[in-house]
A protein has these predicted regions:
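Transmembrane helices of ABC transporter permease
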Residues: 30, 34-45, 77-82, 86-88, ...
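Juxtamembrane loop-to-helix connectors within ABC transporter transmembrane domains
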Residues: 20, 28, 93, 97-101, ...
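Alpha-helical transmembrane segments of multi-pass membrane proteins
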Residues: 82-101, 148, 152-159, 178-204, ...
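Alpha-helical segments in transporter systems
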Residues: 22-25, 33-54, 58, 75, ...
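Helix-loop-helix
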Residues: 65-74, 167-181, 251, 255-324, ...
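An intracellular "coupling" helix at the cytosolic face of ABC transporter transmembrane type-1 domains
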Residues: 25, 32-33, 121-122, 138-147, ...
Length: 593
């Protein structure tokens, strides 16, 4: 898959369907008891609200003409009670739906984050990380209005419409029909606006994603930006990206707010129609109290209809983000446990590649029939030109990718037939880009073994010669490091990652150019620790340092997706082949220095 750049809009692979809304119910279900209680409270509030206009009708048509003070007293009591009940119910509603909505958002956010943890490298390699981040944070938050207010309020408004219609029909069925006369006009307005609004919000979500991706990329590459004095050019690019987002936002909002005034106008016209019909008596004969009560009910009818219209706006907006969220959730991990996968037994360290072929893209083989056997405890140095397939070999061994054909065996077990967790938990992988998490140094070293004691952590650091520099820091092992270890030198980050790998006590150790950025003095300090780290473990090392390569049990020279040469340093030097030429070129370079 070609990489999706920050300025490329992401096309939806599947169009939105009602099934997306049904999927929300999975997250709603755990809170159904609270929802039922809230709905009962809302029904009670609606009934209490509807009592007001009916009491007004009684007072105007009966109580005042008859000067019945006792009746007026009890009506006043009932009215006050209904107002208090309505207030208490509304207070409960606000608190309840906010809690339910935020809990649902929390569950969705947790679910998408957990899913992202299982996706393969290829997913993250093919799109800007900013576009992934926005789906976990911004898009989920955009659903807040829908889930914290929309769904519950929708049901509340529907109940309100039903209860209101019940009271209206009870008072005058014919006048009720007049009240509904303009509903078809509302339906036409909704159908006209719907498609345009959805498309506008799809464009808006794309522009928001693009802007977020560019911000993330710019911050990650700020050192390069400042080194090449690209601040002004980047500012101009961001200004244009930001303007595109603003234009998309304004267009979406303009379309969205076409619905609200339309509903308001229909509500006003309905009120005028009721007055006109009531006064002229077209098919109805109503009292003054009935007409006034009915006008109150018309307001109570159209207010929730207006709210439903606003909910529809929120729904259109939310579905745009739901499309993106569920699109991510529907990405199936390429690498996952096969049915009935077994747990990997304790690893001894024997490794076999049997006629392994692999390709990232169809028709372009990266590995072409790789065959080798490695005994437990051997250290293998993988050397060769860039792009030859060295990193691919270790990625396949850790099963970060699945092979296209052949077999990879660890102690005779096919790596595709055992669980990923049981396999990877017994391997130590140090990738080319040493990653240090924000937090303390001791937390970073403990990352590979969460139950490790402080004594175990210090012992591991001493082995790889990290203890001295850590102890020299102000807070020692409890020194806070920034994201990606930006406050540490490259060599210090490497030493911490070595300690982390040693603490995990892997039986197979993979080092992807792990020592390439360590200075000469640090490398000398590290050498003894590295030897102890490799002792008793099967190891695969991608490195360009002659000292590391020469000390390996065997060397595999990889080129054009094949193992061109294999043997010890002495054996390969005697062949005067690929490795000999590589060694001589590096040796001559060192001599020149």
């Amino acid at each position: 898959m070609a990489r999706n750049k920050f300025d490329i809009d992401e096309e939806l692979e599947t169009a939105f369907s009602a099934a997306h809304l049904k999927r929300i119910l999975v997250y709603v279900k755990p809170y159904q008891k609270s929802i039922y209680i809230t709905l009962f409270v809302l029904l009670l509030a609606n009934v209490a609200t509807m009592i007001g206009p009916y009491l007004t009708k009684i007072v105007i048509d009966d109580t005042i003409p008859n000067k019945n003070m006792t009746q007026l007293f009890w009506i006043a009591i009932i009215f006050i009670v209904s107002v208090v009940v309505t207030g208490l119910c509304m207070r409960y509603r606000i608190r309840s739906i906010t809690l339910i909505g935020q809990d649902i958002l929390k569950d969705m956010r947790t679910a998408i984050f957990g899913h992202l943890q299982k996706l393969p490298f290829s997913y993250f390699d093919s799109r800007p990380h900013g576009k992934i981040l926005i789906r976990v944070v911004n898009y989920i938050n955009m659903l807040s209005d829908l889930l914290s207010n929309g769904l519950i309020n929708l049901i509340s408004d529907i109940l309100s419409v039903i209860v209101t219609l019940g009271f209206m029909l009870m008072i005058d069925p014919v006048l009720t029909l007049y009240s509904l006369a303009l509903i078809p006009v509302l339906f036409v307005i909704v159908m006209v606006i719907k498609t345009a609004q959805r498309k506008a919000y799809q464009v808006l979500s794309n522009k928001q994603s693009n802007m977020n991706a560019y911000i993330h990329e710019s911050i990650a590459g700020i050192k390069v930006t400042q080194s090449f004095s690209r601040e002004e050019e980047n500012f101009e690019i961001f200004t244009e990206v930001s303007n595109e987002y603003r234009r998309s936002w304004m267009k979406a909002v303009k379309i969205q707010f076409l619905l609200w005034p339309g509903v308001q106008n229909i509500a006003v016209m309905t009120t005028c129609l009721i007055y006109f019909v009531g006064i002229k008596g077209y098919g109805v004969d109503v009292s003054t109290g009935t007409l006034i009560a009915f006008i109150g009910y018309v307001g109570n009818f159209w207010n929730p209809v207006i709210n439903i219209g606003n909910f529809y706006n929120s729904l259109i907006t939310a579905t745009t983000y739901l499309e993106r969220i569920f699109e991510t959730m529907d990405v199936e991990p390429d690498i996952k446990d096969v049915p009935n996968a077994k747990k990997m037994p304790p690893i001894v360290g024997n490794v076999d590649f049997k006629d392994v072929y692999f390709r990232y893209e169809e028709g372009v083989d990266i590995l072409k029939g790789i065959n080798f056997h490695v005994d437990a405890g051997e250290s293998i140095a993988l050397v060769g030109p860039t792009g030859a397939g060295k990193t691919t070999i270790i990625n396949l061994l850790s099963r970060f990718y699945n092979i296209n054909s052949g077999e990879i065996l660890v102690d005779g077990e096919n790596v595709e037939e055992v669980t990923l967790r049981s396999l990877r938990s017994q391997m130590g992988v140090m990738l080319q880009d040493t990653f240090i998490f924000s937090g303390t140094i001791i937390e970073n070293i403990r990352y590979g073994k969460l139950d490790a004691t402080e004594e175990e952590i210090i012992a591991a650091a001493k082995v790889v010669r990290a203890h001295d520099f850590i102890s020299g820091l102000k807070d020692g092992y409890y020194t806070e490091v920034k994201e990606r270890g930006s406050t540490l030198s490259a060599g210090q980050r490497q030493l911490i990652s070595f300690a982390r790998a040693l603490l995990a006590d892997p039986k197979i150790l993979i080092l992807d150019e792990a020592t390439s950025s360590i200075d000469t003095q640090t490398e000398i300090l590290l050498q003894e620790g590295l030897e102890r780290l490799l002792e008793g473990r099967t190891s695969f090392i991608i490195a360009h340092r002659l000292s590391t390569i020469k000390n390996s049990s065997r060397i595999f020279y990889i080129d054009n997706g094949r193992i061109q040469e294999a043997g010890s340093h002495e054996e390969l030097m005697a062949q005067h082949g690929y490795y000999y030429n590589l060694y001589q070129s590096q040796f001559d370079m060192l001599q020149a220095l």
